[in-house]
Amino acid sequence: SNDDFKVSISIKESDYEHSDSITYENWQAANKILGILFLHFEDTFKYRPIEINYDNLRVSFDKGCYRGQEIVARMKYLGVDRRKFCTIVAQQEYTVSNDIKITGEIVNLDNIKVFNAIIKTAELDHIRNDPKIITII
C-alpha cells in the first residue's frame, strides 16, 4: 500500500473447479484478444508490421533493425494511420461486412465469434455501433 492505494486479499472457500487445460478454441480466442496473430504460410509477405499491430506489440524503437522499420517509424513519429488492427468479439449471428478485412481465422465459441481484423479508422464508429458487435479491442 501507499498514500493513494491499498491492496488487500481475502481467501475463502469456493465451489469453483478449475482445470489445468483449456480448449484449443479458448486458447485461440485468448491469443486474439491479446492481439497475438499467428500467421499461416499463405499469409507470408501479405502484411506489413504496422498492419498487424507489431509497431505496438512487438517492436522496440530503442534498439535493433527489422524489416519495414522505416515505414513503422515514419507512421509512429509523423503519420496518421488510416487503418486499425483490432480484435472483434461479436455475436454468432454477426455477418462480417465488406468494411472489415479479416486476418487469420474466425474462432467460434458457444454464442460468440472472435477474430482479428483490419478496418479503416473512419469506419470504426460505424462498425462499433452494430448491435451484433459485443466489443472491439
Predicted features along the sequence, with ranges:
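Acidic, low-complexity central loop/insert segments
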Residues: 1-37
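Glycine-rich, small/acidic residue-mixed loop/short-helix segments
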Residues: 24, 30, 34-38, 42-43, ...
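A translation/RNA-centric and nucleic-acid-associated enzymatic feature enriched
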Residues: 48
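Short, conserved secondary-structure segments in the cores of folded domains
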Residues: 61-62
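Structural motif
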Residues: 69-70
